């Protein structure tokens, strides 16, 4: 991995070693990662991985106030393709702008992860948790594909219809999804 960092926290819980093939320094968001992991451990969560990245299309949505309202972006993204609801059934939490690398951002992330597995940091990026890094990444990837479909339709000059609420409810029942 050339542009990602994988670390192992040492037994003293105060230091770490980089275990990836390429020695890439950890993200400046390490405080958020560690705070979230501590929270997950304290709750005996099955989630062991977190991913923070900067998907362009999802970040672009945060520059539109309507998508910062609770579950507006979630419902729009779910409606673009069925896979989005199936791969990201808890939706996309939204965290209003906080200073990057701040304790406030870490605390807001922990709070929002009570209801969502993926959270959007306004005008910054996305943070996801799951059982492993690939599953966390897959959630981000499918959400970003939905954002790309939405933006492509808008660029073609029309508002995409998306799946209806009835169709999304049918998926929830058929696949036994939480929301």
Residue spans for each PLM region:
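Glycine-rich flexible loops
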Residues: 1-179
């Amino acid at each position: 991995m050339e542009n990602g960092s994988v670390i192992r926290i040492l037994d003293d819980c105060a230091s770490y070693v980089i275990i990836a093939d390429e020695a890439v320094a950890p993200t400046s968001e390490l405080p958020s990662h560690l705070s979230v992991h501590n929270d997950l451990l304290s709750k005996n969560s099955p989630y062991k991985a977190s991913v923070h990245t900067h998907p362009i299309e999802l970040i672009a949505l945060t520059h539109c106030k309507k998508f910062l309202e609770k579950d507006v972006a979630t419902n729009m993204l779910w409606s673009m393709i069925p896979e989005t609801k199936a791969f990201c059934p808890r939706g996309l939490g939204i965290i209003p702008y906080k200073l990057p690398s701040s304790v406030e951002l870490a605390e807001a992330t922990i709070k929002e992860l009570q209801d969502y597995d993926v959270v959007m940091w306004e005008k910054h990026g996305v943070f996801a948790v799951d059982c492993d890094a690939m599953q966390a990444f897959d959630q981000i990837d499918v959400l970003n594909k939905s954002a790309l479909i939405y933006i492509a339709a808008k660029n073609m000059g029309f508002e995409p219809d998306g799946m209806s609420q009835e169709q999304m409810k049918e998926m929830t029942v058929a696949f036994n999804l939480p929301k």
